[in-house]
């Protein structure tokens, strides 16, 4: 994930944007930090999903095929 300093800066810029607005440089920094945050979040979510196995009440593996295929691609 993103460092706590970067997350704090994202929150600081969001708060400032609501109160008084951002300069052009701050707006660019905010966009760049948010892009980094979203990329880190997506990578983390994909790793979490690759650890998931869906089992129905009868004990059958009903993991979606798309997820199974994604897991196989990751291993190769």
Curated annotation (Swiss-Prot):
It is found in: Cytoplasm. The keyword Cytoplasm applies. Keywords: Cytoplasm. SUPFAM superfamilies: YnzC-like. It holds the Pfam family DUF896. GO terms for cellular component: cytoplasm. Residues 56-76 are annotated as: Disordered. Belongs to the UPF0291 family. This is UPF0291 protein Aflv_1503. It comes from Anoxybacillus flavithermus (strain DSM 21510 / WK1).
């Amino acid at each position: 994930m993103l460092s706590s300093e970067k997350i704090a800066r994202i929150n600081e810029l969001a708060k400032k944007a609501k109160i008084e607005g951002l300069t052009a440089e701050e707006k660019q920094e905010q966009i760049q930090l948010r892009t980094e945050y979203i990329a880190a979040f997506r990578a983390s979510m994909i790793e979490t999903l690759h650890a998931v196995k869906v089992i129905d009440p009868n004990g059958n593996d009903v993991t979606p095929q798309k997820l199974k295929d994604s897991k196989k691609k990751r291993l190769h």
